[in-house]
Every structure is written in C-alpha cells, then in structure tokens.
Swiss-Prot record:
Keyword entries, A-Z: Cytoplasm, Methyltransferase, rRNA processing, S-adenosyl-L-methionine, Transferase
HAMAP family: 16SrRNA_methyltr_C
Listed EC numbers: 2.1.1.172
Any single biological process term in GO: rRNA base methylation
Principal cellular location given in the protein's record: cytoplasm
Reactions that this protein is recorded to catalyse: guanosine(1207) in 16S rRNA + S-adenosyl-L-methionine = N(2)-methylguanosine(1207) in 16S rRNA + S-adenosyl-L-homocysteine + H(+)
Gene Ontology terms: cellular component: cytoplasm
Name assigned to this protein: Ribosomal RNA small subunit methyltransferase C
PANTHER family in the record: RIBOSOMAL RNA SMALL SUBUNIT METHYLTRANSFERASE C (PTHR47816:SF4)
Role: Specifically methylates the guanine in position 1207 of 16S rRNA in the 30S particle.
Single GO MF descriptor: rRNA (guanine-N2-)-methyltransferase activity
Protein location: Cytoplasm
Pfam families: MTS, MTS_N
C-alpha cells in the first residue's frame, strides 16, 4: 500500500523515465523501490529511523550529499524541518535542478510556493487525493551551513544546563510543560543504568546526568535531528552519555534501572499511540528486577489501563490540570 502522495506521483510516472532520482522528506512507503526499473538510479534520504530501518538503501542522516536529475520531496507538517531540508538540498544542487514537491493539503503544502519562490520558478501541476503536486526549477541557490541552524535555550528548572537543538526537534525553542513536570520528579536518588527513550534534544537524560553524575545515561530517538541535538547538548555541557537511533526498543540492548520518557503521541498530524503502546507493553523486558518505567503524558490519554494490564499497578508522582507523571515498577 502506497501513500496518498505516492498515488499522485504515480499519475506523473513519465517524470521518472531514465533519470537519477533522489527521494527526500517525509516519505513513508516503498514507492521509490517500485521505480527501480524506470530510473537510472534511486537515492533516499530520510531523517526518520522508523522508516529507514524498514527500507533498503536509505540514507539516515541530518546532512546529505548527493546529486540527481530529479529530486522528489515529500512535504510534512513540521515546517522547520521542511525548510531545513529544502534549503540544504537547494544549496548543493545545480542551477536548473528539477524538484517535485508533493504533500497533503492538511499538512500545509500550499505554503511551498511562498517558501521556494525566492529561489526559482514553482507551479502547481496536479491536485488529487487531497494532495498538491508542485514542480520547481532552481534559479537562485541559497547558502547552507549547519552551524547557522542551531538554537539554544536555558530554563530555571534546568539549573545551568543549556539545551541545543536543530529545526524540527520536539520542544526545540523552550522547555515544554510536560517535560518540566517530569523533571520535577527527578532527585539525586536515581542510580544505575538510565534510558531516556524518545530523547528529543536530550533534556531529560542530560538533567539526570547533571544531578546524578554516576548514573549511566543512554538516549534514543527515531529522529536524526533529535539525536544530533542530544549529542551536542551532552557535549556542550561536559556530560557523558550514549546516544543512538532506535524505534522504541528495536535497537535497545541490555536492561535498565530506569526507563524515562516524555513519549510522542502525534505522528505527522494524527494522534498515534503505537510508540507509547510498545513502550509500555515491552518495557518490562528491558528493565532490571525492581526497575522503574516513568513517563509523563496528557491526562486524557488512556495509559493508566495499559499500565495496569502490564504492571498490575501504577503511581501518579505528579500532576497538573493537563499532565500526569506515571511510575510503575518491574
């Protein structure tokens, strides 16, 4: 089953004949692989590990160096990430580079004309499946340097910690209230091996390491920009920790004394519980005896029943009108 965006691209299959093609952005299916016989070569660049690990020949990275006759970009709702990736692609392309941009209308693809018009000619060439397809030709190359995209912030809750983040990372500009509530439950009694799952810019894991230097910190995420941000947050604050990609527990080895998370419940623009369901249902296999799973979540989300099913009982360590911090022991 291919996505709505790919279904629209199928209507314009002649664009791909005999060309080297680079697919990038929020691609989520195997459409590129189906074009292998039509194209001279295919490259895929994704910053999402949950996609990259399930497909062949995907470049999972923050930065990508590659040339192609045609670039196909899948628009996402994450506008900061879209801008970061498109500017990067345009900066390394040649004048006259041809790009197809496809996206669902509800994800804001209509704004592509405003985004790209300073750099060349853009025109809408199709509208179907609640998607828009645009054709772009590069005339004016932008400048791209990764260092220009870093953002930092501090917060009284974080003491003297400085958070570093790239575009598109959750809570990239300021400390979100859910994480702040979760941090309020952290004390200097935490010890042993700690997993910050879905680490984002590394706020939680870095704060634990700062308060309890003897804790062994591991941070994981599916987002390449988040992983790079977490690494920089650790290094710039002279903290030690391991950071790597994992789709929930897909690449996790060993067991932990604490698994802590502010788990995502938005997938694109839809609410999605898959990751959190896997986190709760599989956590006990990754916890030491007596180990703890601690998560913060919106109060309306149906996690208490799931926690009760797999851990018998749970505690609410802190709560506000909007969020609750849940704790269960293995």
């Amino acid at each position: 089953m291919i996505s709505l965006e790919s279904q629209v691209l199928e209507r314009h299959i002649s664009f791909f004949d005999g060309k080297s093609v680079l697919f990038a952005g929020g691609i989520s299916d195997s459409f590129p692989q189906t074009l292998a016989s039509k194209c001279s070569s295919i490259q895929i660049w994704s910053c999402y590990f949950d996609y990259a690990r399930t497909q062949s020949a995907v470049n999972f990275s923050v930065e990508f160096q590659g040339q192609a006759d045609l670039i196909v970009y899948y628009w996402t709702k994450n506008k900061q990430e879209v801008n970061f990736q498109l500017i990067q692609l345009l900066a390394q392309a040649s004048i006259g580079q041809e790009i197809l941009i496809i996206g669902e209308n509800r994800c804001g693809v209509r704004s592509v004309e405003k985004t790209l018009s300073p750099y060349g000619e853009i025109a809408k060439i199709d509208s179907a499946r609640r998607c828009g397809l645009y054709h772009f030709s590069l005339q004016n190359k932008p400048h791209f340097e990764l260092k220009n995209f870093w953002r930092t912030y501090q917060h009284s809750t974080l003491e003297n910690l400085t958070i570093y983040s790239l575009p598109g990372v959750f809570s990239a500009a300021e400390l979100d209230t859910g994480t702040e509530l979760l941090l309020s439950t952290i004390d200097n009694k935490i010890k042993g091996k700690v997993l910050d799952l879905g680490c984002g810019a590394g706020v939680i894991g870095s704060m634990i390491k700062k308060r309890t230097p003897n804790a062994q910190i591991t941070m994981t995420d599916i987002h390449a920009m988040a992983l790079e941000s977490a690494r920089k947050t650790l290094s710039e604050n002279q903290l030690q920790g391991e950071v790597y990609a994992s789709d929930v527990f897909s690449d996790i080895e060993g067991k932990f004394d604490l698994i802590i998370s502010n788990p995502p419940f938005h997938d694109g623009i839809d609410t999605a519980y898959r990751a959190v369901t896997e986190l709760i249902t599989q956590a006990k296999w990754h916890l030491n005896q007596g180990g703890e799973l601690r998560i913060v979540a919106n109060s309306f989300l149906p996690y208490p029943e799931l926690l009760r099913q797999h851990f018998n009982d749970y505690q609410v360590l802190a709560q506000t009108g909007k969020f609750k911090v849940y704790s269960v022991k293995n």
